[in-house]
């Protein structure tokens, strides 16, 4: 009987394969794109101090918390309902009251996103443009292709592309992180039929607020990739440890939460080398 792929992965890990965490920690006040603030709040509504009593025979106590968080914060994946073009999603689904409700979306929400287990490709633009890239720089298609050539990598329609700007190291310094470099519209348009998902170590994949001269919109990557092509975007990835390995092709795993109706979901992405 052929050995199953999952067991092969376990064998790889037992033999020393590296598992690299690509998620940032989450906390109240963490960096967030302005329209989705506050990103997260957390409260302990049950505390050990209030439930403990010396009169109890076993003296067990409990504590529980409440998380209040936007679905577009932290290390996350955009669902395909997150963007539309002329009030239609990538597959022509119209945005109307049957699809978009006050309680969430009925189609292309986060609950529909499958586990992502695919080849990952790191495009580390810092090797060409400096670490980190200049503030608010938009990676051009020429620069993107130069990095790919320099790394010697290839990718196809079923693969995941992770682009590093070097700003992930500033996760705890929002004054720097908010000015991270991003990806130009021409790169996103180029990738719109060439991959399964993309991600970057910044707030929005794109550079927030910059108008794309070709499409006339801000965040052109969200237009070309999600709204027009049905390609997932991941944001706020932590790529620093992966970059240190100088490994540009790897097994990528990200598990979205099955949250009905939501426009995005937290993920715990890892790279297995």
Task: Walk through the language-model features, giving the residues of each.
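Active-/binding-site microenvironments in catalytic and ligand-binding cores
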Residues: 1-273
């Amino acid at each position: 009987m052929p050995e199953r792929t999952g067991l092969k992965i376990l064998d790889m890990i037992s033999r020393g394969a590296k598992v690299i965490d690509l998620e940032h920690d989450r906390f109240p006040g963490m960096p967030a794109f302005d329209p989705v603030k506050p990103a997260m709040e957390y409260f302990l509504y049950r505390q050990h101090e209030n439930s403990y009593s010396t009169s109890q025979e076993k003296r067990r106590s409990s504590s529980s918390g409440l998380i209040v968080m936007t679905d577009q914060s932290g290390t996350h994946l955009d669902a395909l309902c997150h963007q539309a073009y002329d009030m239609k999603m990538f597959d022509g689904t119209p945005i109307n009251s049957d699809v978009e409700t006050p309680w969430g979306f009925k189609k292309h929400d986060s609950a529909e996103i499958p586990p992502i287990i695919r080849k990952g490709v790191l495009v580390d633009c810092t090797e060409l443009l400096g670490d980190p890239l200049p503030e608010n720089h938009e990676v051009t298609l020429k620069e993107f292709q130069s990095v790919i050539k320099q790394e010697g990598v290839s990718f196809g329609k079923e693969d995941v592309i992770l682009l590093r700007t070097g700003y992930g190291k500033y996760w705890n310094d929002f004054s720097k992180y908010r000015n991270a470099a991003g990806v130009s519209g021409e790169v996103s348009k180029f990738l719109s039929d060439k991959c399964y998902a993309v991600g970057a170590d910044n707030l929005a994949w794109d550079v927030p607020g910059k108008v794309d001269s070709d499409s006339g919109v801000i965040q052109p990557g969200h237009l070309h990739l999600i709204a027009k092509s049905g390609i997932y975007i991941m944001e706020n990835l932590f790529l620093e440890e992966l970059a240190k390995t100088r490994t540009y092709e790897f097994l990528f795993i990200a598990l979205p939460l099955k949250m009905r109706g939501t426009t995005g979901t937290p993920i715990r992405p890892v790279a297995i080398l």
